Amino acid sequence: MLLGVNIDHIATVRNARGTTYPSPVEAALVAETHGADLITMHLREDRRHIKDADVFAVKNAIRTRLNLEMALTEEMLENALKVMPEDVCIVPEKRQEITTEGGLDVLAQQEKIAGFTKILTDAGIRVSLFIDADDRQIQAARDVGAPVVELHTGAYADARSHAEQIRQFERIQNGAHFAGDLGLVVNAGHGLTIHNVTPIAQILAIRELNIGHSLIAQALFLGLPEAVRQMKEAMFRARLLP
């Protein structure tokens, strides 16, 4: 199983004081050195954390691959074609939200998403759609030509009872298997921590997890190398469980 380390909140800390540090590039290189299989960045329309220059700098510095999260806008499409990341994950975006609140509604935007997917695919960029684990959305993702889906794990991570967490887990598990049966590559992420990652990592249909906020929070106490190492180890051990 692959680990994508999201470095958005390295930029959040930097921007809080308007300084040049901590460096997203340095964070990306440290994460790679200590187990990250890819680096994920979300260039939001309001540029609240990652800036345009960060994306170019990280793309040019890393040895693994860049997964660029972006909204379904012409501006972001143009940026992606300039940066040329290995992967683009199209996500829903609202300016007033603190973080991404739900999955992309592919059903409601099939024509536009299909157009973006074709343009990016023709440019050699693999497209992923960040969606809820809903069979209709998963089928729509396949219909628009996206080869990859990233299942939104936020409801699982935020569940306030064990019963609700189990319900959300089963939804993700079923969605992952359905997507896999359709021939889609399945990733997952949002809200995952060292404490809740194991069940998700046990779903064999899921190939990659993208994790950011909790890793950066852990890094405040453990250091980024150890935070990445522990997450990677937790994912590895989960795969060994019956």
Swiss-Prot record:
Major localisation: cytoplasm
Catalysed reactions, as listed in the record: 3-amino-2-oxopropyl phosphate + 1-deoxy-D-xylulose 5-phosphate = pyridoxine 5'-phosphate + phosphate + 2 H2O + H(+)
Gene Ontology biological process terms from the UniProt entry: pyridoxine biosynthetic process
Ligand binding (3-amino-2-oxopropyl phosphate): N6, R17, G191, G212, H213
Alphabetical list of Pfam families matching this protein: PdxJ (PF03740)
The protein's annotated pathway: Cofactor biosynthesis; pyridoxine 5'-phosphate biosynthesis; pyridoxine 5'-phosphate from D-erythrose 4-phosphate: step 5/5
Keyword field: Cytoplasm, Pyridoxine biosynthesis, Transferase
Site (Transition state stabilizer): E150
Signal peptide: none
GO cellular component: cytosol
Localization, UniProt: Cytoplasm
EC number(s) reported in the record: 2.6.99.2
Active site residues according to the UniProt entry: H42, E69, H190
Top-level EC class as recorded in UniProt: transferase
UniProt binding sites for 1-deoxy-D-xylulose 5-phosphate: D8, H9, R44, H49, T99
GO molecular function, one term: pyridoxine 5'-phosphate synthase activity
Keyword Transferase: yes
Function recorded in the entry: Catalyzes the complicated ring closure reaction between the two acyclic compounds 1-deoxy-D-xylulose-5-phosphate (DXP) and 3-amino-2-oxopropyl phosphate (1-amino-acetone-3-phosphate or AAP) to form pyridoxine 5'-phosphate (PNP) and inorganic phosphate.
Similarity remark: Belongs to the PNP synthase family.
PANTHER family tied to this protein: PYRIDOXINE 5'-PHOSPHATE SYNTHASE
Subunit structure: Homooctamer; tetramer of dimers.
Name of the protein in its database record: Pyridoxine 5'-phosphate synthase
Organism for this UniProt entry: Neisseria meningitidis serogroup B (strain ATCC BAA-335 / MC58)
Gene that specifies this protein: pdxJ
